[in-house]
Amino acid sequence: TSMGTSNFIGGGGLMADPYTGLAYPQRIARAELTYKTGLPITPTLDWLTVNQADQITVPEDAWVDWDAAAQKFITVGEKFPDGLTANIKSVSVYPDDLFETVKWHDGSPISVADFVMSFIQGIDPAKPESPLYDASLALSIDAGLVSFKGYRIVSTDPLTIEAYNDTYNADAELNILPLWPLSPFGL
């Protein structure tokens, strides 16, 4: 779909192998997956680092929701003051030259704002306070937010994005959540 939960739990930073369906990096330089010990997750390919942890604590400053009325992100610390844990933590690290070499259709360079806006566009239509509210999308977006635990931009040089989620796939490669934008910020 072009809207709804697919916008904030996946994207074009990866591409699918046409025979196996496993993800390969398309726009990311490297990735790391940490999953909760005991989950049935197995890596097949060697392009990502895979670790286990007894507990994955979501940082308080991770963005977990969007306040359409105030036009601001809601952090984990604000929404879950007692803390939040996740089943998986995905880290996507983009190439050092991402902002110089990747261009949009009009020639403008991709920017951090494009990544941030992609997350907003994935959630905003579910918010009744939003001028973009769409009741037909709200249920699927809200369903995705139940297992979504947060995004956090930890660096812009190189761009490094952490994602936290409770939904997981048995194939480690399919748990990388790159937040790749589908359109430029200015659209």
Language-model features, listed with the residues they occupy:
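The feature preferentially marks the first beta-strand/turn patch immediately downstream
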Residues: 1-122, 126-187
